[in-house]
């Protein structure tokens, strides 16, 4: 069920602007002028506008299926190229772009309205084809156009049959038999999604919510109630790690899930995947990793694993770990009488792996790995090791890496109790790691401490690994790079050497975009930790992109090894053809609410371009609030100044300034004759301060209760400012749940008329039953062209027999 509560802003009066003293006025003018010059220079330096991925909806699919999806893109053009990192999967555009989309009401008012604006996407229809041999998990993808390449984002390949949320429903959506995955979207603020499910057999049911891993802004609040309304599950993803929860369900009892954002926020980008399975969820395992090629008895811990009861239980299974040297994990599926658990990831290690004994006093043989848990909240564990002088050991406490909620700290003490080393988080994770150079032969104490407060349960484990610090190298590079035609791109490769490795590091690309070349030999010199690769793009190259893989082949010891550096999307781009600047630089203009503001824009044409320009809203706005919007506007050839129409809704607050930033799109042929769309972001911003409206529409119908199939006569009153005397048409605006079920003939009020009545006819359809909110809109044209709009809302309860 979709539920939302619209907030209607109260009328606000304009604040009086006091006259400033001349000296202060001059100082402020000087400051603003200087700031404008700084912003102008900054904007000029960063004018290239590369695309970004917003979302995929539905956000994935099951292996062996083809799914029609919607791609939400920020600053996309019609000529996008799509790249999936798994070459088995096909993602293709099948339809044109939507207009730039502004988030629908309700809007934030008051303090929250001062927060950052959601990006404005365009949506593209696309088709996702996932072959049957693709394993479940996250799949990375990127996009590119003639303006650059995007960072990678992800969609998910699932394990269960999939359905899409019914966004038009009025009650909880009934889910089919488990397992099932629901692709959903919290599309508006204050929205709550509701789902209902049953199981034919009592036992554990696992609910998995994936959103943050899809780059969704959703911090989920999830609650499950039984048929009597009792809460049986309540969880909040305040840390942004997504949710996997287990409850004990009774047979044939309807349970209802409610799901919303922690802050009751919502937008098209708030996508999620909700998977329900009849079966338990493994929360921890002992061991967390097994020795390569060996069979270990593994204790699995989770709710109801042994008896199906509502308590933490454990079961033992023998697990044989893969022997292949390039396999580092095993997705293990535990079978239980209540259904299979979700796949659980076990590590595959080259160390001998053990579980810390109950006494927790036995020494750890090194090199080795040990899985344990901490007895108390914020507690510590101690591990005794014997080390020799001159050795260097790599010591890691794994928690986040194995799915544990713990946040660990690692400390080493000598035999005399003196602290020798300590570490907390390392880049990219909350797991601690250190390289310990042993100062003397003897016994050492490794202390693992939890800082999260989530220790004290066997469901929160960790793995300690101690192994010699071997010679090796880890390399990193950016995930995307744009190279303008006829120039050089600079790609910086970073190397982290460990274990004393100092040798040269040869590098090689598997491919490059057409027209892009680099040196025949790419090598990070011995003892150096970085290399800048010059990527030269020919002036006559096409604008194109390619997903390129970089591999390193250093000689470590006596063996040449292969180390993947990563994948980068390289895009050849074209120079800007225009520069847009608002007349008056960063001025703020007063604009009547509910009217169209004609914003003056200055155009500088570059590289000899004289053709038409399409102006549109840029995706990343600043102070863009409460439905401020504009449509595409075509600037004729040769024009150097235009007035761009921006509609300022009547509900915008008069106490806050708003901003609008534009893109200019032009079509230009590249050297190979391919027509590409170049996108240029406006320098500085258009400033708007809403003031009193030119027109206001109200009604005297009150709150009505009517029967299905009836007619409603709604008395209306229209107030106008003296300077606005145009005819006004009044009409009913049906929302997506009312379309085809309600109708009303529009009425027109002449400049002399101040009231009228709209007759609304209801269909005899049960889908209308309940509370309905009807929007009535009045539209007039200022100067015969520019819309002036006012709205009012009528609350109607549709009840059979009324």
Could you tell me what each predicted segment is?
Residues 129-135, 248-252, 264, 319-326, ...:
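Short, surface-exposed loop/turn segments at beta-strand-coil junctions that are enriched for proline
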Residues 115-120, 237-240, 248-249, 426-429, ...:
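Short proline/glycine- and polar residue-rich coil/turn motifs
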Residues 48-103, 185-329, 334-337, 348, ...:
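Acidic, Ser/Thr/Pro-rich low-complexity intrinsically disordered segments
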Residues 48-187, 258-375, 449-456, 460-461, ...:
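Ser/Thr/Pro-rich low-complexity tracts
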Residues 86-93, 509-520, 618-632, 733-746:
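Short, solvent-exposed loop/linker segments at beta-strand-coil boundaries, enriched for Pro/Gly
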Residues 66, 121, 136-138, 202, ...:
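Extracellular Ig-like/FN3 beta-sandwich strand-entry sites
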């Amino acid at each position: 069920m979709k539920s939302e509560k619209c907030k209607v802003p109260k009328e606000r009066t304009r604040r009086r602007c006091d006259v400033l003293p001349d000296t202060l006025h001059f100082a402020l003018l000087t400051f603003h002028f200087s700031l404008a010059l700084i912003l102008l220079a900054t904007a000029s330096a960063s004018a290239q506008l590369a695309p970004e991925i917003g979302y995929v909806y539905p956000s994935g699919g099951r292996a062996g299926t083809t799914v029609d999806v919607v791609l939400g893109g920020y600053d996309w053009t019609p000529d996008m190229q799509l790249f999936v990192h798994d070459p088995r999967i096909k993602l293709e555009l099948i339809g044109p772009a939507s207009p730039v989309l502004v988030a629908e009401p309700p809007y934030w008012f008051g303090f929250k309205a001062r927060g950052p604006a959601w990006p404005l996407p365009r949506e593209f229809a696309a088709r996702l084809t996932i072959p049957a041999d693709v394993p479940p998990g996250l799949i990375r993808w990127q996009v590119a156009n003639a303006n650059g390449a995007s960072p990678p984002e992800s969609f998910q390949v699932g394990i269960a049959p999939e359905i899409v949320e019914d966004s038009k429903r009025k009650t909880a959506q009934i889910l089919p038999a488990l397992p099932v995955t629901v692709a959903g979207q919290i599309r508006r603020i204050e929205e709550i999604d509701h789902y209902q499910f049953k199981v034919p057999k009592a036992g554990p049911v696992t609910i998995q919510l994936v959103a943050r891993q899809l780059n969704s802004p959703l911090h989920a609040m999830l609650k499950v109630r039984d048929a009597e309304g009792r809460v049986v599950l309540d969880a909040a993803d305040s840390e942004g790690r997504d949710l996997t929860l287990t409850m004990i369900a009774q047979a044939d009892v309807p349970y209802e899930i409610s799901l919303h954002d922690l802050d009751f926020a919502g937008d098209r980008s708030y996508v999620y995947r909700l998977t329900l399975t009849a079966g338990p969820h493994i929360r921890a395992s002992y061991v967390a990793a097994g020795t390569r090629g060996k069979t270990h008895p593994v204790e699995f811990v989770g709710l109801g694993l042994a008896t199906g009861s509502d308590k933490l239980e454990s079961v033992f299974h023998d697990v044989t770990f893969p022997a292949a040297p390039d396999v580092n994990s095993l997705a293990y599926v535990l079978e239980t009488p209540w259904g299979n658990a979700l796949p659980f990831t076990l590590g595959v290690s080259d160390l001998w792996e053990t579980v810390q004994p109950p006494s927790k006093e036995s020494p750890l043989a090194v090199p080795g790995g040990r899985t344990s848990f901490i007895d108390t909240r914020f507690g510590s564990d101690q591990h005794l090791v014997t080390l020799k002088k001159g050795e260097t050991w790599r010591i890691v406490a794994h928690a986040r890496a194995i799915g544990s909620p713990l946040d660990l700290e690692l400390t080493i003490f000598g035999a005399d109790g003196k602290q020798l080393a300590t570490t907390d988080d390392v880049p990219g994770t909350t797991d601690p790691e250190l390289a310990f150079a042993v100062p003397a032969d003897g016994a050492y104490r490794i202390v693992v401490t939890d800082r999260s407060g989530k220790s004290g349960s066997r469901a929160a484990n960790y793995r300690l690994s101690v192994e010699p610090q071997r010679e090796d190298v880890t390399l990193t590079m950016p995930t995307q790079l744009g190279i303008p035609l006829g120039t050089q791109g600079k790609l910086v490769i970073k190397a982290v050497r460990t274990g004393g490795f100092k040798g040269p590091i040869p590098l090689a690309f598997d491919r490059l975009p057409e027209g892009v070349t680099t040196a025949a030999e790419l090598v990070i010199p011995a003892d150096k930790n970085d290399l800048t690769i010059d990527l030269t793009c020919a002036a006559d190259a096409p604008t194109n992109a390619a997903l390129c893989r970089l591999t390193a082949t250093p000689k470590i010891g006596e063996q040449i090894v292969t180390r993947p550096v990563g994948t980068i999307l390289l895009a050849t781009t074209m120079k800007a053809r225009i520069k847009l600047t608002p007349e008056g630089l960063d001025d703020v203009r007063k604009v009547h609410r509910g009217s169209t503001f004609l914003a003056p824009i200055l155009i500088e044409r570059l590289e000899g371009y004289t053709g038409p320009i399409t102006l549109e809203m840029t995706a990343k706005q600043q102070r863009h609030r409460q439905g401020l919007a504009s449509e595409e506007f075509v600037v004729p050839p040769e024009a150097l100044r235009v007035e761009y129409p921006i509609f300022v809704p009547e509900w915008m607050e008069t106490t806050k300034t708003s901003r609008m930033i534009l893109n200019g799109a032009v079509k230009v042929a590249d050297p190979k004759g391919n027509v590409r769309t170049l996108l240029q972001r406006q320098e500085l911003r258009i400033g708007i301060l809403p003031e009193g409206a030119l027109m206001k529409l109200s009604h005297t119908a009150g709150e009505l209760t009517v029967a299905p199939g009836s007619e409603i006569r709604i008395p209306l009153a229209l107030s106008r400012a003296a300077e606005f005397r145009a005819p006004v048409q009044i009409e009913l605006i049906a929302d997506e749940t009312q379309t085809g079920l309600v109708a009303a003939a529009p009425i027109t009020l002449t400049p002399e008329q101040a009231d009228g009545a709209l007759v609304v006819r209801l269909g005899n359809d049960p889908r209308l039953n309940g509370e309905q909110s009807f929007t009535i809109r009045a539209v007039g044209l200022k100067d015969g062209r520019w819309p002036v709009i006012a709205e009012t809302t009528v609350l109607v309860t549709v009840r059979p027999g009324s």
